[in-house]
A protein has these predicted regions:
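Non-catalytic accessory segments flanking P-loop/AAA+ NTPase cores
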Residues: 1-479
């Protein structure tokens, strides 16, 4: 994938075209918004503070690509991304999720993204250390002597609280194992080199060994009180205290392959600087984060029905988040001034003007997405990367069944999906999933005992779907 900083808006649209059919206006809008972020980063710091993202409101029926455009844009930009539904939130003071949780979710997404990147950077070093651990277990006589350092604070807490922390079923300390005679240095090196080569080649993968695994200390139930940790102000105190508790070690009997994975994970945790991860994640979420608010039309006050306190209250709670505010997360404070908000809704029962005026003003860019036509469906079936028909062909090929899907069959599938959408409920491209599942049901059930090659043409499509599509009552339940 090319560097996002090298992509012009036209090239960003071309990248989105790889996965999404049509909707050129929406793609143009998000491409310009993404490019403006890069343009802003090149400006003086004083001017950067005054340039805020122009939030986008997408209007269009379900299944036309609103969510997919935002998701692919975030993937393309390497930006933290969360998708939330406006209907899940309630006004402050009512039972339910408060709107600030969407910002906390963004912080979590950024932490996962940066942590995964750091894991990739230390993967080789962690794997090397894991192999050395395994050699210590396989050949303890070659393990260099080490002094056992302890955490005095953890030891004090452990002695005060005893088994209140960590594993409640922990076994009492066992007497120390007898000391293993050390091999001469040159002999130790030879043994370790040979063992390292054998482990790398996978010779020991299925061999069972006994290892000690650290178990995170857990605070007793009720010690920190109730409540959702994600809603705690000033950070997760229980997580902080758990880090101060003495680590419990449990013995497990696992294969060498599993031990290598377990040790590598432990080493990654030691090599990654989580403070640096948090700082970078919060910076990235604040500067590049994208929050996609779906079903925003469901919290609009419908015309002629009067004010709805709950709906309008949620809008007013969302307003300061979109305007730019600072939210406290368990990782630190996150400012939303430069987070890009993309809202979307079908607006069947309401209009964008039914949103409160202040919220309307925070989404200055409005794009209307078009309903999909039969020609669009044909393109969706065949053109995008890993298109639907390619997926079904690959799945059946795994069972040795070769599919030959003729062009007239593709046209028939698109026509039937369009007719059902027009007659019943328009669910956009999602209709193709239900149609294709019905079409390939018999072939998928018969494989792999069926014929090794199956041809799908227009008569076959009509045979499988024609009667159901023509019968409105049946199609309501099946398609």
């Amino acid at each position: 994938m090319p560097d996002i900083q090298e992509l012009t808006p036209r090239q960003i649209v071309a990248e989105l075209d790889t996965y999404i059919v049509g909707q050129h206006k929406a793609k143009r809008a998000v491409a310009i918004a993404l490019r403006n972020r890069y343009r802003r980063e090149k400006l003086p710091a004083e001017m950067q503070r005054d340039i805020i993202p122009k939030n986008i409101l997408m209007i269009g029926p379900t299944g036309v690509g609103k969510t997919e455009i935002a998701r692919r844009l975030a993937s393309l930009a390497g930006a933290p991304f969360v998708k939330v539904e406006a209907t899940k939130y309630t006004e402050v003071g009512y039972v339910g999720r408060d709107v600030e949780s969407m910002v906390r979710d963004l912080a979590e997404a950024a932490i996962r993204m940066v942590r995964d990147e750091r894991r990739g950077e230390v993967k080789d070093a962690a794997d090397h250390a894991a192999v050395e651990h395994i050699i210590d277990v396989l050949h303890p006589e070659t393990k260099p002597p080490q002094s056992s350092a302890t955490n005095p604070f953890a030891s004090t807490l452990g002695s005060i609280f005893g088994n209140s922390f960590g594993n409640q079923n922990a076994q009492p300390a066992q007497p120390a194992a007898p000391t293993v005679a050390q091999a001469p240095p040159h002999e130790s090196q030879r043994i370790r080199d040979e063992a390292r080569t054998d482990i790398e080649r996978g010779f020991y993968d299925v061999r069972l060994i006994e290892i000690e695994v650290e178990e995170a200390a857990q605070l007793p139930m009720g010690m920190m009180g109730g409540g959702d940790p994600s809603q705690m102000q000033g950070g997760d105190m229980s997580e902080m205290l758990a880090g101060l508790m003495p680590k419990k070690k449990a013995k497990k009997r696992v294969t060498v392959a599993d031990a290598r994975r377990i040790f590598a994970q432990e080493e990654e945790g030691k090599l990654i600087d989580m403070d640096a991860v948090k700082r970078e994640a919060l910076r990235r979420a604040g500067e590049r984060g994208i929050i996609f608010i779906d079903e925003i039309d469901k919290i609009a006050t419908r015309e002629g029905r009067g004010a709805d306190v709950s709906r309008e209250g949620v809008q007013r709670d969302i307003l300061p988040i979109v305007e730019g505010s600072t939210v406290t997360t368990k990782y630190g404070t996150l400012a939303t001034d430069h987070v890009l908000f993309i809202a979307a809704g079908a607006f069947h029962m309401s209009k964008p003007s039914d949103l409160i005026p202040e919220l309307q003003g925070r989404f200055p860019i409005r794009v209307e997405l078009d309903s999909l036509t039969a020609a669009d469906f044909e393109t969706i079936l065949t053109q995008p990367k890993n298109a639907l028909l390619m997926q079904y062909t690959a799945l059946l090929a795994a069972d040795g069944v070769s599919l030959d899907i003729r062009p007239d069959a593709i046209a028939a599938i698109a026509r039937i999906a369009t007719e059902v959408n027009e007659r019943d409920e328009n669910i956009g491209a999602r209709r193709l999933h239900t149609v294709l599942e019905r079409l390939f049901e018999e072939i998928g059930y018969a494989a792999p005992e069926s014929a090794p090659a199956v041809t799908i043409d227009a008569p076959y499509v009509v045979e499988r779907l024609g009667e159901i599509a023509a019968n409105a009552d049946l199609s309501n339940f099946i398609l």
